[in-house]
Curated annotation (Swiss-Prot):
<feature type="transmembrane region" description="Helical">
    <location>
        <begin position="506"/>
        <end position="526"/>
    </location>
</feature>
<feature type="transmembrane region" description="Helical">
    <location>
        <begin position="255"/>
        <end position="275"/>
    </location>
</feature>
<feature type="transmembrane region" description="Helical">
    <location>
        <begin position="566"/>
        <end position="586"/>
    </location>
</feature>
<protein>
    <recommendedName>
        <fullName>Uncharacterized protein MG242 homolog</fullName>
    </recommendedName>
</protein>
<keyword id="KW-1003">Cell membrane</keyword>
<keyword id="KW-0472">Membrane</keyword>
<keyword id="KW-1133">Transmembrane helix</keyword>
<feature type="transmembrane region" description="Helical">
    <location>
        <begin position="603"/>
        <end position="623"/>
    </location>
</feature>
<dbReference type="GO" id="GO:0005886">
    <property type="term" value="C:plasma membrane"/>
</dbReference>
<keyword id="KW-0812">Transmembrane</keyword>
Length: 632
């Protein structure tokens, strides 16, 4: 049994809220492509020019080819600010009717069957291939953008799938394979721990003086120094012992800028999607794109300059109008303080952020006809057992995303050599237990496995069957929901319960709830995967508990309001009582003879009235303090 091909992808989810009603009207207007291509064309001939123009406007805003043009325009903006005249960051797919380059293509991952056609209209899948001569190739080979217009939740759920390893392994050294996996794990560890949350604020802080780059440079230097410290101590000091220092430094720098620039490119794409899908008039944006727009500047820049240009571009286009927060540079003396500053600024801005990177590893094997038993496939295959362990239980190998001590390459290599040495034997019982717990799907063409926290998948297949798309969309479905819950919990932790948002949060969470009759974006093939993910993560239970929590707080809030009204009622009664009391006293005492009103009967009445007034005061004070205590 030989390894034929290995592909490792990082899936990074996002969502965009407040999607304009125009897009859902467009979807409802033409629920399927067959309707558009056949029936709608006949209807158009009976409409007036005004009705026809309105119909075309609504129809076009969700068309796959129109979204592709919009996304390509974003990529053209990025290309105009980066790279060189001889090497763009992205591979050119073709040229459009204006002879302008097209850097993105649509991906048809699933058959467009008639039953689930209404969901296919809301699924978008695109691929951006990285230029093989670009420094971005140090980190990523291709970027896949997948998103879905969720009519029920009124959001756009999406993910970026980064193809970070794509190797033919026919003559590949196994050590080189594990080295590539180790390096990508180290990058994921850095991103998750140093750049959380992954947002524009991780790269940009506002400053009144746009020409003053001190703030930006200081912050980037913190990240860059931390990167150098981690990557040299964990990796480059061991793999580049016999190489020139200049070459090693250059490799480390290029990898840093490739990673940072890739993240920035994704964030810029999200912001452009947000601008478009939040727009009340998206048709106006499309009309502008129908004209020839040439943005090519062809700068000759190095990767560091690209990073600064992308930051400047993002700051000008996405932060300048709504960003008022400034970075308190004097307050930031360490990375922890830097991350805290980012967190506070994120609370004050509306820009979207990315989820943690999830991992999908797809391995193609040679000389395997059908998978009959998982244990039979793994028996006596120490390399395969090791790969399973690294992907499904990376913490055991010291390369987990949250590992307290991330092992260096030398330690990791020694551990792999020890495990894959047949003379040392293997803990077959322990491995089979892990295997049984991690099984997700068993098919004669492929086997799939899932980690305990649902953040990693391993796909083992015996031919070129396309399996990864199912897992990309399953992770998108799951991670979007988990990410929204995390955002709500984060706001609760930082801001407390906001009574004005109770109803909207409850409605959003209930729209995200699901059962096993859910259409799952019209992809029935991901239902089994979602069941396995939920068994590990308890996503359904988490949503239900969050809804119950908000409803409980809503009931408490209503009771608080009732108590406030009660206090006001007592205060009003007290005021009326005092007025009546003093009216009565002055009525009794206003006589010509001062002693005439002081009869036993009048004194008793005044005493009783005074006592009742005192009771009213005591009750009002007690309720006031009790209400403050309950609120606290």
């Amino acid at each position: 049994m030989e390894f034929n091909k290995l592909q490792l992808s990082h899936c990074i989810s996002f969502y965009i809220s407040d999607v304009s009603e125009v897009f859902f009207e467009s979807i409802n207007q033409h629920p399927s492509r067959d309707f558009v291509n056949n029936i709608l064309q006949k209807i158009k001939s009976t409409l007036s020019e005004e009705e026809l123009e309105k119909l075309n406007t609504i129809e076009e805003v969700t068309k796959d080819e129109k979204i592709l043009i919009m996304l390509n325009h974003v990529l053209k903006k990025i290309v105009s600010k980066t790279g060189s005249s001889s090497c763009d960051l992205f591979q050119i797919v073709k040229h459009d009717r204006f002879n302008e380059p097209v850097y993105i293509q649509s991906v048809n991952a699933f058959e467009n069957n008639l039953i689930n056609n209404e969901f296919a209209e809301r699924r978008y899948d695109y691929l951006i291939e990285i230029n093989k001569h670009s420094y971005l190739r140090k980190y990523v080979n291709a970027i896949r953008i997948s998103f879905f217009l969720d009519l029920r939740a009124q959001i756009l759920s999406g993910s970026f799938t980064l193809d970070v390893i794509n190797k033919q392994l026919e003559h590949q050294n196994k050590e080189e394979l594990f080295q590539a996996i180790y390096l990508r794990s180290l990058i994921k560890h850095f991103i998750s721990n140093q750049l959380y949350p992954i947002s524009l604020n991780s790269f940009i802080f506002g400053d009144k003086n746009r020409e003053n780059k001190t703030v930006e440079n200081d912050k980037l230097s913190v990240l860059k120094n931390n990167w150098n410290q981690i990557f040299f101590s964990k990796y480059f000091d061991f793999v580049a012992k016999n190489k020139e220092e200049r070459v090693v430094d250059n490799n480390c720098d290029e990898l840093f800028y490739a990673t940072m620039n890739t993240l920035l490119i994704m964030l810029i794409i999200i912001e452009e999607l947000r601008v478009y899908f939040n727009s009340k008039e998206p048709a106006l944006i499309l009309k502008l794109l129908d004209n020839k727009v040439s943005l090519r500047e062809d700068p000759d820049q190095n990767p560091e300059t690209d990073l600064h240009e992308l930051i400047k571009f993002a700051e000008k286009n996405y932060l300048e109008k709504e960003k008022t927060s400034r970075w308190h540079k004097k307050r930031v003396k360490s990375l922890e303080e830097l991350l805290e500053e980012i967190k506070q600024i994120n609370l004050e801005t509306k820009n979207e952020s990315l989820a943690y990177p999830d991992e999908i590893v797809e391995l193609e094997l040679d000389n395997v006809h059908n998978f009959v038993s998982t244990k039979q496939v793994f028996r006596h295959q120490l390399d395969l057992q090791t790969l399973h362990g690294i992907v499904i239980n990376p913490e055991r190998y010291g390369i987990g995303m949250w590992s307290n001590h991330f092992v260096d390459w030398e330690e990791f290599k020694d551990l792999i050599e020890q495990i894959t040495d047949a003379e040392n034997g293997s803990d077959l019982y322990g491995f089979e237990k892990d295997l049984d717990e991690s099984i997700c799907q068993v098919n004669k063409k492929y086997l799939t496995f899932i980690s305990s926290d649902s953040s990693s998948f391993l796909i083992i297949k015996n031919d070129q069957t396309k399996v990864i798309s199912n897992y990309v969309w399953a992770q998108l479905y799951f991670e979007t929901r988990r990410w929204i819950i995390n955002d709500i919990e984060y706001d609760l932790y930082e801001k407390g319960f906001d009574k004005s948002h109770f109803a909207s949060n409850i409605a959003l969470l209930e729209s995200l709830n699901f059962n096993w009759l859910d259409p799952f974006y019209g992809l029935t093939s991901i239902k089994e995967i979602m069941q396995k993910i939920d068994s590990k993560s308890n996503l359904k239970t988490s949503i239900a508990e969050m809804v119950a929590k908000f409803k409980h707080e809503q009931r408490i809030s209503k009771k608080d309001n009732e108590r406030v009204l009660m206090i006001f009622a007592y205060v009003a009664a007290a005021v009326v009582g005092f007025i009546n009391f003093f009216s009565m006293v002055f009525t009794i005492l206003t006589v010509s003879d001062l002693n005439a009103g002081l009869t036993p009967a009048n004194i008793v009445v005044i005493a009783i009235a005074s006592l009742l007034a005192l009771f009213l005061i005591v009750i009002a004070v007690l309720f006031r303090f009790r209400w403050k205590y309950i609120k606290h």
